[in-house]
Amino acid sequence: MIFGLCRCQLTLDAMTLFDNMSQCDVGSWNSTISGLAQNSEGKNELFLFKKMRLEGAEVDVMTMSGVLSVCADLAALVNGKQVYGLVIKYGFELYLPVGNAIIDMFAKWGCMEDACQFFMNMPIKNVVSWTSLIVGYGKHGLGWEALEAFDEMERTGIVPNKIAFLGTLYACSHAGLVQKGWGNFDTT
């Protein structure tokens, strides 16, 4: 019900319903947090996450990946570092959605060394992991690094998606490597 209200952009009604619940489980917390995120209410989402922690509610993979994404989008470094600390404390970094959110967060902050280091230590990677790294390189003018990551992704057998191609082309255009970027489209 809460998530449905949020999907209809009735976040105030969703919050009222949530606040009037006698008991909240991790699912109701996650639905509310996720619903707020869908409506670009990141600050409210962070407030709700803090409330969740203060009330001693359980967190899970969905909670952490969602909150990390908000920290990335808001460029909320202090909050993001605190959430990252919780992720490590609870061992959630081993879960692919959380790991991908961490790479994306570091990349959006411009911390490409941290993004790359975390990426290298991930036990499992998928196209989202690789694409987050490639797009991060592109946003920060690191065209050669984006190309190397793209090539390595293909060598590992992961099939690039449209976002990976666009991220590579974007990276190349910002680094003056447009012809090299188009080469990825010709060979794939």
What residue spans do the PLM features occupy?
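Alpha-helical tandem repeat RNA-binding modules
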Residues: 1-188
